[in-house]
Regions:
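Beta-strand-rich receptor-binding modules of extracellular spikes/adhesins
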Residues: 1-87, 93, 148-149, 169-172
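Conserved, well-structured core segments
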Residues: 17, 127, 160
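Generic signature of intrinsically disordered, low-complexity segments enriched in small/polar residues
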Residues: 38, 61, 85, 119-121, ...
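Short alpha-helix boundary/capping segments
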Residues: 61-64, 70-73, 100, 154-161
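Short, electropositive, low-hydrophobicity segments enriched in small/polar residues
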Residues: 64, 131, 164
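C-terminal intramolecular chaperone/autoprocessing and neck/assembly modules of extracellular spikes
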Residues: 80-155, 172-179
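Long amphipathic alpha-helical coiled-coil
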Residues: 159, 163-177
C-alpha cells in the first residue's frame, strides 16, 4: 500500500513494516501493534523497542572522535565483537551507598580461574565458573531470563575486587619490609 499524501510506504499485506519517507524511520508492527522502530536522529541511528523505553540500541557520535566504520559483529553463537572499546557508566553521581570492598584478598583467593571448552562452540576459553563465583561475590553474577536461567559473570566488575586485593597485598608487603 502506498499513501502518497503522507509519504509512507507500507510493505506486507498486513502492514507489518512501515517506511516513513518524511522522517526516514522504519516502524515494525504486528497485528496493528507497534513493537519497534529504526530511527535516524540527526546523524545517529537508534533502534527502539516500543514496549519499553529502556530497550534501545543507540549508535551515534557523542562529540568525541568519530569512528567512521563502527562495527558490532554478533555471531550465531551469541558472541559480540566491537572494533572499539566498550565502557560502562561509572560516574559517582549515578551511585549511592559507596563502600570499599572489604576482605577483597580473601575473596579473590577463593576465586578459581579456569580454562575450559565451550560446549556450544568448541572454543577454548579462560574465565570463572559462575556458580562458584556466586557463592563468593553474588553481585558479580546475573541470572538470565532463558529457560535454563543461565548464569553470567560481569567480568568488568571483577576488577574492583582485583584492585582492592592488590592494595591489601601491598600493605602486607610494606608491613613485612618494615620489620
Amino acid at each position: 500500500e502506498i499513501d502518497v499524501s503522507s509519504g509512507n510506504l507500507t510493505l506486507d499485506v498486513a502492514g507489518d513494516i512501515i517506511l516513513d519517507a518524511a522522517g526516514g524511520d522504519i516502524f515494525l508492527k504486528e497485528g496493528g501493534t507497534h513493537y519497534g522502530s529504526i530511527k535516524r536522529n540527526n546523524n545517529d541511528l537508534q533502534i527502539h523497542s516500543e514496549t519499553s523505553d529502556e530497550d534501545m540500541l543507540f549508535v551515534g557520535n557523542d562529540g568525541g572522535s568519530v569512528i567512521t566504520a563502527l562495527t558490532l559483529d554478533m555471531s550465531a553463537a551469541g558472541a559480540a565483537t566491537f572494533n572499539s572499546s566498550v565502557t560502562e557508566n561509572s560516574d559517582e553521581r549515578l551511585k549511592s551507598n559507596i563502600t570499599t570492598i572489604p576482605d577483597a584478598l580473601s575473596k579473590v583467593t577463593e576465586m578459581r580461574g579456569v580454562h575450559y571448552i565451550r560446549k556450544d562452540t568448541g572454543l577454548k576459553r579462560t574465565g570463572l565458573i559462575a556458580q562458584e563465583l556466586q557463592k563468593i561475590a553474588p553481585e558479580l553474577v546475573s541470572t538470565g531470563e532463558d529457560e535454563m536461567s543461565t548464569l553470567s559473570v560481569s567480568y568488568a566488575n571483577v576488577v574492583g575486587y582485583l584492585i582492592e586485593a592488590v592494595k591489601e597485598l601491598s600493605e602486607k608487603i610494606a608491613a613485612l619490609e618494615a620489620k
